[in-house]
A protein has these predicted regions:
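Short, structured surface patches at the beginning of a domain
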Residues: 1-148
Length: 148
């Protein structure tokens, strides 16, 4: 189980496919995941767009507003590509989470491996906690980024 029972989370989904059913299915899956692990879902948002741009990312902006206003303690996504496929954008979002002391929780990937594969592990360090069930899942408190 995750280490953050009864903590406030925001769920974010991005879907490049124009079929809204895919985004809603992903959103409902994450809501079920959050409920099953005792998270308190304080908000959800999603975008139908490419993961390589910030254009038309109203859902991402809404999530970041919740983070910056202290309304959540964690952001729940399937994987890092939900945030962005562009490393520059991803690092910027991770920095905002870090500055606000917000956890990033992924449900469909090994976050540590994903950060290493994307070359971003040097930006976020190695403070990962393995969940105790199913396939490897991680939640991470992002440490200071010393350089870009």
């Amino acid at each position: 189980m995750y280490l953050m029972l009864n903590h406030d989370v925001w769920i974010y989904v991005r879907c490049a496919n124009n079929d809204p059913r895919i985004a809603f299915d992903r959103l409902y899956d994450l809501i079920d995941e959050a409920a099953g692990h005792g998270f308190l879902v304080r908000g959800t948002s999603f975008d139908h767009c490419s993961g390589n741009t910030l254009k038309d990312r109203i859902g991402l902006r809404t999530m970041l507003d919740a983070v910056e206003n202290g309304r959540v303690e964690a952001v729940l996504v399937r994987d890092l590509e939900q945030i962005s496929r562009n490393s520059y954008i991803l690092v910027g979002v991770i920095e905002i989470l870090r500055q606000n002391d917000v956890y990033l929780i992924t449900t469909e990937c090994d976050l540590n491996a994903e950060l290493i594969n994307s070359g971003l592990e040097r930006f976020v360090g190695d403070r990962f906690t393995r969940a105790s069930f199913g396939k490897p899942r991680f939640d991470v408190r992002l440490p200071l980024m010393d350089q870009f």
